[in-house]
Amino acid sequence: MLILTLLTLSACGMTMTEKDFENQTPKLVLEDYFSGNLVATGLFEDRFGNIRTQFTVDITGTFDGKTLTLDENFVYSDQSTEFRRWVIEKTGPNSYSGTTENAIGEALGTASGNSFHWTYKFRLNVGDDVWKVKFDDWMVLQPNGVLLNKATVYRWGIKIGTVFLSFRKQAAVEAADGEPARLAS
């Protein structure tokens, strides 16, 4: 029983790092992957495992050699919409910083192998309230070109939920479906 308890406690202390992905392929180059038109599908799950909302995102990305700009158009399951523009600077061979209107300060991130990890603080609209939250965001590129994203959201240091997203290049969506990708209606 003591050994089982020790193993459980040691597993709780393990944290995923960028180093865990450094030799994984295909290599994720953020500015290459996000240049052009993409479609994302996602959901937000609260800390109790309840899906609170689902959404699609139509994304247009441009890279000028130093700055990646992402224009994101969200459509939520209740038919509400939101526009967000991320401006992401490449600050080193594998490092990035980004800003968007509701971000508090800068988002800081590192690409490693097939992954991208970044953290940031954000003003999140929740009903008629605005909550200050922290995102711990991991993206992992799959061999089929799908980019999976898991973002854990914290408020006052307590996990309030998780965002799950799946990104695909719009051309890949059109090829698979035989027609142009469309936002949920």
Q: In which residue ranges do the predicted regions lie?
A:
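Bacterial signal peptide processing site
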Residues: 13-15
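Glycine-rich, aromatic-bearing surface loops/beta-hairpins
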Residues: 136-185
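Amphipathic hydrophobic-ligand
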Residues: 51-57, 130-135, 159-163
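N-terminal helix-cap/turn-to-beta initiation motif at the start of protein domains
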Residues: 21-37
